[in-house]
Regions:
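Helix-loop "lid/cap" segments that line or gate small-molecule binding pockets
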Residues: 71, 87-94, 105-108, 128, ...
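Basic, helix-initiating cap at the start of DNA-binding domains
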Residues: 1-22, 26-38, 52
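Short hydrophobic/aromatic patch on the recognition helix
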Residues: 36-47
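Amphipathic alpha-helical segments used for helix-helix packing
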Residues: 84-115, 138, 146-150
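A secondary-structure capping/hinge motif
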Residues: 51-53, 98
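Hydrophobic alpha-helical segments that form the core
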Residues: 132-172
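Amphipathic alpha-helical linker/stalk segments
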Residues: 57-84
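Amphipathic alpha-helical packing segments from all-alpha helical-bundle domains
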Residues: 107-138, 161-164
Length: 173
């Protein structure tokens, strides 16, 4: 691993430990740089701000969940595929809901952020569909994301309730 990659990884590990111990708001970039044994300036050579660090931490963890979900994906119809991935993703989002509330509050209206998430779900759910209906795909994606946002907005997010809600919504397809 290169020195740059090693430093990047140390930042992510230190930040994740601090975020989980102290919370996002009570963790400063100075604390992250100190825990990483680097200068604050070096931290900002790797990340633009604290939210970018959080996003990278969550992306790392999310990618592990994504791989597990892909390994067990045997579903064909889009409505079953979206439920399959939602089982994994909603559980992960609920487990880390404090952090996703912060991330979504900062990035939700960012076009690149929206596009990245829409493309991921679209590629997972519709990649092997014999006929791709753009309107149907958009509606399924809307159901997925609105259920996610509504569920994470609850005081105590409930994965089972979110999955049941999504299943009811997509059952019309």
């Amino acid at each position: 691993m290169s020195k740059h990659a090693d430093t990047h990884q140390r930042i992510l590990e230190a930040a994740w430990n601090l975020f989980t111990e102290q919370g996002f708001n009570d963790t400063s970039t100075r604390q992250i740089s100190a825990a990483s044994n680097i200068a604050v300036g070096t931290l900002f050579n790797h990340f633009s701000d604290k939210v970018a660090i959080l996003e990278a931490c969550l992306d790392d963890k999310f990618n592990d969940v994504l791989e597990r979900a892909k390994e067990t994906d045997i579903h064909r119809p889009a409505r079953l595929k979206i439920n399959h991935y939602a089982q994994y993703f909603y559980q992960f989002y609920c487990l880390h809901h404090r952090f996703y509330k912060v991330l979504f509050s900062q990035r939700l209206f960012s076009q690149p952020f929206q596009q990245q998430h829409m493309e991921l779900i679209q590629s997972l759910v519709f990649a092997d569909q014999p006929q791709f209906n753009k309107v149907k795909a958009a509606i399924l994606l809307d159901c997925y994301f609105m259920t996610l946002l509504y569920g994470l907005g609850a005081e105590t997010p409930n994965t089972k309730l979110m999955l049941r809600t999504l299943s009811q919504k997509v059952s019309v397809f």
